[in-house]
Amino acid sequence: MDACIAPATDKLIVDVVFPFTLSTPKYGPSRPFTGNHAAKAAYVDALEAELASLDDEVCMRPVSAVRLSGGASIMSADKVCHLVRRIKKTLNLVPGAEISIDVEPLTVCTPSLTDWTSCGITRVNLAALSCDDAELTALGAHHSREQLQNALLFLEKFHMANVNFEVLYGVPGQTAASWKRTLLTLAGIDALHVSIRPLVDAASDKAWTAAQTGKANTAQEGVPAAPLPSPETRRALYEQAQRILGERGYTEIAPGDFAKSGLAPASGVFGPLMRAGADVLGLGAGARSRLDGFLYENACDYDLYVAKSADFEAIVRNPLREDEQSLHARVCPPIENLTAAQRFEFLETIGATLAR
């Protein structure tokens, strides 16, 4: 192992992981738990216990951004907001720190938005996936195009303008024409920030899920997932997005991330800092951390995490020092230093895990 190297930035960001899903997806990355109301409530309580167990040294570090990731929006909004308030009291958030939440369109409504805005959530990462009903069906999505439109109306009603729209390329059955319609729809509503991500086959996530939970990831309702398009087709779709969004006033600020030109805040805070190599404090089952040159991962086992979340030694898996090779693998150079081929390679390699 090479000697530990300094991080690319001295910033600290916090990733609070909610490994819950409404149902098993056809495609990954997988979230292994569905869970009833009681299980979800117990999980949030465990997050608060892990938060309370942090060392004073960690709690004193300035935090630039907090992300509530995964299935955060399908949890009780009241419980999530209580957790956010605990985070604010426990950690040293800098003035104006970003607090973002990953959101399923079906969960965007008056009660959830009332809670999210009241506790200080400042950014929404909306899992739009596609603006085409046939593609949403192929993905096994929980929402339709109409329900996505309804979510946008609610966000507008609550003046939540800091929204990132995540859409997927490489969907089975996706064509250049359907992909163009999705991109034009987002440009037509003046989306400030659009993230395009490669669709990941659940099978690629199968080994990790099985190792962590003892259960293999399977296609939704036992139906085999359709094969993904070829790399050549996927690259053509990526390049198509670059052209269409570029012609409509968007700048690619990182591989797959497009912001309205001249609107720097639209790029968010968490994502750029993650790509720059910021230290990451991960909280929750399966959360991954990088602190002071060490990498470690929390166990994904729900029962273990809920019972032992305050015991670092009981829940942490595979702590090791980060070497230069692993740092370079996850840090994205400035986009102007990347060729077109390098941008696509970076996005395809780790794009599905990129923060927005």
Give the residues covered by each predicted segment.
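C-terminal scaffold of the Radical SAM
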Residues: 4-11, 33-57, 61-348
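C-terminal functional modules
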Residues: 348-351, 356
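Flexible, acidic/Gly-rich N-terminal and inter-domain linker regions that tether
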Residues: 1-23, 28, 74
